[in-house]
């Protein structure tokens, strides 16, 4: 593909138009005008024909995979090399995907016979997590006579993975990441003794009779006591709801039923908060010595990662979450609980990140949760919209419309409270979260379970 340059425009304006005007008024000069026009057209055709395959010998190499973090500036690098060692002034670009946040769309690269390869990079600040694939890059340079911009397209293979940004939420829960014995650690008092058997030892004065191992005592003919330790390597599963309600923003509604924009950036939703909380909880569970698992569902189970530990497992969970998008369907809790009942045989802590403010969805959840509540410890976390609180709780009322709005918020708050009481009879714990403190409160909930040895 070619496009005329500014020089070509000037050549046409000064080399064709004046002779043509002169030939129109003075017929003897018509031959001169025709000759100038033919020469300019022939030169332009020659210049274009000699640059049809100008990109032959050029190679453009991108990394196969580039990993970036949302809202953190990074580099997208490529290597340009000319095996024919020509002097070229290149302009390089590619089709930018939404959310990549390129600082500059087109880069300029100058190749010379002495420097036939060069490394260039685009500055970018992605603001949306997900997977971006670059399949083609576009090159442009000037022809030999500089009458044309000659362009070409080259196939490339580059995958950009943008992961969630955990920075601000990690700071709010930083105490959970401190190792035992370090200065500044937030100490958590353990309630009760451990329940996991560690070893046998000889009876000592003051040991409880209930800890005596009677079979070993009879065999050795002297009292033997069982020693217990705090439970380790327990299984913790985060269950993420990616159905239609997770696409909402947690900012609440204004009087005109528009979502408040000052609470979160435009691209964030409830699902973004769920993903951030899940990845942070994985790190905390790893520091506590527990095994972390992940389950994603909407109207079916979309992804299941069995509880394990280690860096490779964290990468597997991150790969399962970074491309997750809301699906406009209603969640099927019956299928979800049947899947959990069949796959999770060992007692585990199940932390649900879902939405139950829809009465139909809440009824379906309450109806089927007993399938797993007797075997597992179930914790439900819902992020309530801004303003959902008891009637005339904190928000000021200025006119009649505010009264109706607060009344609607009160009905929604009362519905969640009734659901919380109903689920408590089945041994299920429901916790209402605010958007700003969601990640920190979920981690605190997990630490309390560890402290009280509820699992």
Task: Outline where the language-model segments fall.
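Extracellular/lumenal glycan-associated context and N-glycosylation machinery
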Residues: 1-59
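An amphipathic, basic-hydrophobic helix/alpha-beta surface used to engage anionic
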Residues: 38-312, 347-352, 367, 371
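Short beta-alpha junction loops
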Residues: 300, 383-388
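Acidic, Ser/Thr-rich peripheral helices and adjacent loops at domain boundaries
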Residues: 315-317, 387-417
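Exposed acidic/Ser/Thr-rich ligand/metal-binding surfaces
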Residues: 331-384, 452
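Long, C-terminal catalytic modules of enzymes
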Residues: 394-395, 414-455
């Amino acid at each position: 593909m070619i496009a005329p340059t500014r020089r070509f425009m000037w050549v046409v304006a000064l080399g064709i138009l004046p002779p043509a005007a002169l030939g129109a008024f003075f017929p003897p000069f018509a031959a001169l005008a025709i000759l100038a026009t033919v020469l300019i057209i022939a030169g332009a055709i020659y210049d274009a024909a000699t640059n049809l395959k100008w990109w032959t010998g050029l190679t453009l190499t991108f990394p196969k995979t580039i990993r970036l973090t949302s809202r953190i500036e990074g580099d997208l690098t490529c290597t340009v090399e000319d095996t024919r060692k020509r002097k070229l002034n290149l302009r390089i670009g590619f089709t930018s995907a939404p959310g990549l946040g390129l600082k500059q769309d087109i880069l300029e690269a100058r190749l010379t016979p002495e420097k036939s390869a060069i490394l260039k990079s685009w500055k970018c600040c992605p603001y949306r997590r997900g997977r971006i694939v670059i399949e083609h890059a576009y090159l442009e340079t000037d022809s030999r006579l500089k009458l044309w911009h000659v362009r070409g397209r080259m196939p490339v293979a580059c995958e950009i993975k943008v992961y969630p940004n955990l920075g601000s939420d990690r700071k709010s829960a930083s105490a959970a990441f401190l190792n035992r014995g370090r200065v500044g650690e937030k100490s958590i008092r353990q309630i009760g003794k451990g329940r996991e058997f560690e070893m046998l030892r000889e009876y000592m004065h003051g040991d409880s009779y209930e800890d005596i191992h009677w079979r070993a005592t009879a065999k050795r003919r002297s009292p033997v006591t069982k020693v217990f330790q705090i439970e380790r390597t327990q299984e913790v599963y985060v269950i993420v709801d990616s159905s239609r309600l997770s696409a909402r923003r947690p900012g609440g509604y204004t009087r005109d039923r528009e979502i408040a924009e000052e609470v979160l950036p435009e691209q964030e939703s409830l699902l973004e908060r769920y993903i951030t909380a899940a990845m942070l909880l994985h790190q905390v569970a790893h520091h506590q010595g527990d095994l972390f698992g992940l389950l994603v569902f909407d109207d079916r189970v979309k992804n299941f990662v069995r509880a394990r530990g280690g860096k490779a497992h964290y990468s597997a969970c991150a790969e399962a979450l970074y491309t997750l998008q809301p699906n406009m369907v209603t969640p099927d809790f019956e299928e979800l609980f049947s899947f959990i009942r069949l796959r999770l045989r060992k007692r585990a802590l199940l932390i649900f990140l879902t939405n139950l403010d829809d009465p139909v969805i809440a009824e379906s959840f309450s109806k089927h949760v007993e399938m797993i509540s007797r075997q597992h410890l179930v914790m439900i976390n819902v992020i309530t919209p801004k303003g959902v609180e008891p009637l005339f709780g904190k928000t000021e009322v200025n006119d009649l419309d505010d009264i109706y709005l607060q009344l609607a918020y009160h009905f929604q708050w009362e519905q969640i409270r009734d659901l919380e009481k109903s689920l408590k009879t089945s041994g299920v714990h429901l916790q209402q979260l605010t958007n700003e403190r969601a990640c920190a409160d979920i981690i605190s909930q997990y630490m309390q379970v560890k402290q009280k040895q509820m699992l």
